[in-house]
Amino acid sequence: MDPYKHRPTSGANSAYWTTNSGAPVWNNNNALTVGHRGPILLEDYHLIEKLAQFDRERIPERVVHARGASAKGFFEVTHDVSQLTCADFLRAPGVQTPVIVRFSTVVHERGSPETLRDPRGFAVKFYTREGNFDLVGNNMPVFFIRDGMKFPDMVHAFKPSSKTNMQENWRVVDFFSHHPESLHMFTFLFDDVGIPLNYRHMDGFGVNTYTLISRDGKAHLVKFHWKPTCGVKCLLDDEAVTVGGTCHTHATKDLTDSIAAGNYPEWKLFIQTIDADHEDRFDFDPLDVTKTWPEDIIPLQPVGRMVLNKNIDNFFAENEQLAFCPAVTVPGIHYSDDKLLQTRIFSYADTQRHRLGPNYLMLPVNAPKCAHHNNHHDGLMNFIHRDEEVNYFPSRVDPTRHAEKDPMPPRVLSGCREKCIIDKENNFKQAGERYRSFDPARQDRFLQRWVDALTDARVTHEIQSIWVSYWSQCDASLGQKLASRLKIKPNM
């Protein structure tokens, strides 16, 4: 064994107890005292180390997506998309790539029930031959806001009050009464899909718009979609109360038990693509994260399948320390100018550095499985053994060179420096279309959830009227029904 390169694992456990530094421990039951009843001695280093380690076991929970469950498996390409992207892991049908997936609730804390009405996170880390690719999405295809400037305020509105530490509906409807762009997202959150049956029976979406780059440098805007082969199933409100009151971890248990029984969850991956030169041809902005791309004019294209066939070995190491960031991409898949995506590129990595430290990408679950090399040395909790003499670039001693240039197409950008909203807001059309796609019973459940939210004692008449106006612009009958239930006169 090379003593300088040994990485501790549970597979190398000794047959007896030791301290963290490896010294044998002959008594792990009793503290060192003066006599049988005397005071504990400070020299009992094993006791001090044991308590100190225990005091530091927990790390800051994620500011969002704190409650989560992970599983491992593989992604397999089933359809040729090599004409659209030069991404190596998508190079040909039959190619398999290891993955780890984390499902989560968004707003609520680490120990909260998995039956609360909340979006679900759906994050996939692909361990490719050209580095990791993190596809960090949700189970709903759109989002509440289109500009990341509003993200901290939005999360504050959803999170418990800083005064009472309780989540309060009046704060949510107050904040979003200023943001009609949220209406489309609320047609998902307040719909039946707002509470998935479990993680196996829910869709996944990349949500943001990315860019695919082909080998000849052609760019296509792209949306990613995961479809479960076992179908989408949801819990109605009363069912969620019953399930959540019985087991707070029902979705995690279902995922773990299904994999252990050999009933492996599977999703099909589809994409929608738009020629980057044609993005102005629609009545919506393809970079607007509050909009879906109509499948009748931009059809889904099959790409591959993902199978989760292995449970994680350790919750802390492979769930709490598992870190995702939309900035982590591979050649052939790039960002777009989606305002929310641009914000996430910074924020996700920044929050992981806060939770896990500057070297979080060295943790085994986050590290790439391919060979990699840079001069990002040292820092807190750097545990990679290095023996290089050259930690700078360029060098005539170290032969490390630049990689081949990506076929990124050139772009000409022009415009004034300004803070502004997009031209094509169109906040009401898609929300109304989705509401009208519901059957009458589903429409009524959606309406009742809004009545419940808007009859909170702290919700003012002004806020109620604004929401009636918004929903009236989506669908006149919905606005009238909401006004009638709230006993207020509609403005439209």
Curated annotation (Swiss-Prot):
Its EC number is 1.11.1.6. Pfam families: Catalase (PF00199), Catalase-rel (PF06628). Signal peptide: none annotated. It is found in: Cytoplasm, Cytosol; Peroxisome matrix. Its main location: cytoplasm. GO terms for molecular function: catalase activity; heme binding; metal ion binding. InterPro entries: Catalase (IPR018028), Catalase_AS (IPR024708), Catalase_clade1/3 (IPR024711), Catalase_core (IPR011614), Catalase_haem_BS (IPR002226), Catalase_immune_responsive (IPR010582), Catalase_sf (IPR020835). The keyword Iron applies. The active site is at residues 65, 138. Disulfide bonds: none annotated. It catalyses: 2 H2O2 = O2 + 2 H2O. Heme binds at residue 348. One of its GO terms (biological process) is hydrogen peroxide catabolic process. Keywords: Cytoplasm, Heme, Hydrogen peroxide, Iron, Metal-binding, Oxidoreductase, Peroxidase, Peroxisome. Catalyzes the degradation of hydrogen peroxide (H(2)O(2)) generated by peroxisomal oxidases to water and oxygen, thereby protecting cells from the toxic effects of hydrogen peroxide. Belongs to the catalase family. Homotetramer. This is Catalase. The gene is CATA.
